[in-house]
């Protein structure tokens, strides 16, 4: 039997920045859990619209955009 693992609460739609001075990004949905227990989350760069995968632990550490 396989266990169903629910993704953590994701702040979908929040605008955050990479560190204090980095570019802004919008948080998307959880994509998949990694072997170390972290989650990959879809993010979208505000200025360019480019999308990427980003670790949930980094999202939680990044500040909200100003």
Model-derived features: where do they sit?
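Mixed-charge, Lys/Arg-rich low-complexity intrinsically disordered regions
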Residues: 1-14
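A short beta-strand micro-motif
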Residues: 11-19, 43
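Short acidic/polar mixed-charge low-complexity motifs
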Residues: 21-24, 48-50
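Short beta-strand-centered aromatic/proline hotspots
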Residues: 23-32
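Residue-level recognition of conserved beta-strand positions in structured domain cores
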Residues: 29, 43-45
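A cross-taxa feature marking solvent-exposed loop/turn segments within ectodomains of secreted
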Residues: 34-36, 49
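Short aromatic-glycine-enriched beta-strand elements
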Residues: 37-42
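Intrinsically disordered, low-complexity, charged/polar segments
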Residues: 45-66
């Amino acid at each position: 039997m396989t266990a169903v693992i629910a993704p953590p609460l994701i702040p979908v739609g929040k605008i955050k920045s990479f560190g204090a001075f980095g570019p802004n990004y919008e948080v998307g949905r959880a994509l998949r859990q990694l072997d170390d227990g972290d989650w990959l989350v879809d993010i979208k760069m505000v200025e360019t619209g480019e999308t990427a995968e980003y670790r949930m632990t980094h999202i939680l550490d990044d500040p909200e955009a100003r």
